Amino acid sequence: MHIMEGFLPVEHAIGWSVASAPVVAYGLYSINKKINKNPEQRMLLGVAAAFTFVLSALKMPSVTGSCSHPTGTGLGAILFGPSAVAPIGAVVLLFQALLLAHGGLTTLGANIFSMAIVGPFAAAAVFRLARAARFPFGVGVFLAASLGDLLTYVTTACQLAFAFPDPVGGFTASLAKFAGVFALTQIPLAISEGLLTVVVMNALLRFNREELGSLNIEGNGQEVQA
């Protein structure tokens, strides 16, 4: 998902940065508001950030100019809401660009938009729909994390197709090519991420019930099943 340094045209890099900036700014406001109201949530916020950093650092080669990896943003989106994940993802992506050579500074805005905005908002929406449909809690967690991961990569494929349309088939043909190559690695990774997120949520429900009690998480103190 990390689009590499200098790969996008300048106008695309600027456009994605402009689109991402207000969401990240609102996310900072959202986090400050939540932490000021419930200071005990700092630990859970740290867990969500660490989960995102570790999973998204596990990359493997994929489409030219990008790579495949879990995103780890579903957990934070479920716990704190999608807007709070935007600044977390932005910091994670910045550190990875500077320290691990994953992604880059010129493509930071595009990577934030896909991994830290679209993915978390998709995960939160799926989780809410699953709860509204009365799916088991664990199924909702699994679907949210897995589909949030997949939609992150659909967004990256769209970004690449928009920047590099096929000479004959245009955007649609290019999107099919990018998405098809991503799917080979990303579908198994998304399933794995969904299962791992359920495991982590189980641990949080077992050891951090008090902190989770201040969040709108309906685990009822029970371990969840995928």
From Swiss-Prot:
HAMAP family, alphabetized: CbiM
Pathway involvement of the protein, from the record: Cofactor biosynthesis; adenosylcobalamin biosynthesis
Keyword Cell inner membrane: yes
Transmembrane segments: 6-26, 43-63, 75-95, 107-127, 135-155, 181-201
Protein name: Cobalt transport protein CbiM 1
Gene3D superfamilies: 1.10.1760.20
This protein's GO CC annotations: ATP-binding cassette (ABC) transporter complex
Species the sequence originates in: Pelobacter propionicus (strain DSM 2379 / NBRC 103807 / OttBd1)
Stated role: Part of the energy-coupling factor (ECF) transporter complex CbiMNOQ involved in cobalt import.
Gene Ontology MF term list: cobalt ion transmembrane transporter activity
Family: Belongs to the CbiM family.
UniProtKB keywords: Cell inner membrane, Cell membrane, Cobalamin biosynthesis, Cobalt, Cobalt transport, Ion transport, Membrane, Transmembrane, Transmembrane helix, Transport
Disulfide pairings: none
Origin superkingdom: Bacteria
Assembly information from the UniProt record: Forms an energy-coupling factor (ECF) transporter complex composed of an ATP-binding protein (A component, CbiO), a transmembrane protein (T component, CbiQ) and 2 possible substrate-capture proteins (S components, CbiM and CbiN) of unknown stoichimetry.
Source taxonomy: Bacteria, Pseudomonadati, Thermodesulfobacteriota, Desulfuromonadia, Desulfuromonadales
Principal localisation: membrane
InterPro entries: CbiM, CbiM/NikMN
NCBIfam families the record matches: cbiM (TIGR00123), PRK08319.1 (NF006184)
UniProt-annotated location(s): Cell inner membrane
Membrane-protein topology: Multi-pass membrane protein
One example of a Gene Ontology biological process annotation: cobalamin biosynthetic process
